[in-house]
A protein has these predicted regions:
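Membrane-proximal alpha-helical signals and transmembrane carboxylates
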Residues: 1-199
Length: 199
């Protein structure tokens, strides 16, 4: 199965410009009080309500948190909050809180299955505490935390201390139920100050 990622998609029969979209790089999902809580880590563009140019010394990401009856509903609420279409074609990682139920993966991941732009090789992980906490990690070195998460997972796989779990791996279990291992990520306080060269 080969999944292709495309940067072009249409809405109501017309192509959306980059200024009309918000690029989502990472997503956190939790289940609280009968609703899904979604945290989207999105890239700040110059036109997002401000004429101020981007500060290239900062990470230039922001997190939007919304809830809904389904994950798709929560994403749509985030779009209303942002005032723009959320594009999931750049999604690199999806993190889950431990209270999420994966017993019906086809229904659970319908938001991704029905979106032709979502890359089925996107990394999946579990949060040691909450997915929202992971999505709110602020970096100051110009890289996105989604990139750091995927790098941590790949390094763990290389060193034999964890396993990789991609969306396509989990979806492959829909018709043949089985256990799927998923890496767990936790937030650790940095030792020392950035000025000392420690992270």
């Amino acid at each position: 199965l080969i999944a292709a990622v495309t940067l072009l998609f249409s809405s109501f029969g017309r192509q959306l410009d980059i200024e009309e979209r918000v690029l989502c790089h990472a997503m956190g999902v939790a289940y609280e009080d009968g609703e899904y809580k979604v945290s989207l880590q999105v890239f700040k563009t110059q036109g997002m309500g401000s004429e101020t140019p981007l500060d290239v010394s900062q990470s230039n990401i922001q997190t939007v948190n919304c809830s809904g009856r389904t994950i798709r509903d929560a994403i749509e609420s985030c779009q209303y909050q942002l005032g723009r279409e959320v594009f999931l074609g750049h999604l690199q990682i999806i993190c889950f809180s431990k209270n999420v139920d994966f017993s019906s993966p086809e229904e659970f991941f319908s938001f991704a299955i029905k979106d032709k732009n979502v890359f089925l090789g996107v990394e999946l992980c579990m949060a040691e505490n909450t997915a929202e906490e992971l999505m709110n990690v602020q970096l100051t070195r110009g890289t996105m935390s989604s990139e750091n998460f995927t790098q941590v997972i790949k390094m763990g796989v290389k060193n034999g201390i964890t396993v990789e779990c991609r969306l396509i791996d989990l979806l492959s279990c829909i018709r043949s139920p089985q256990y799927v291992a998923m890496p767990v990520i936790s937030i650790k306080e940095p030792q020392g100050d950035f000025s000392d060269g420690k992270e």
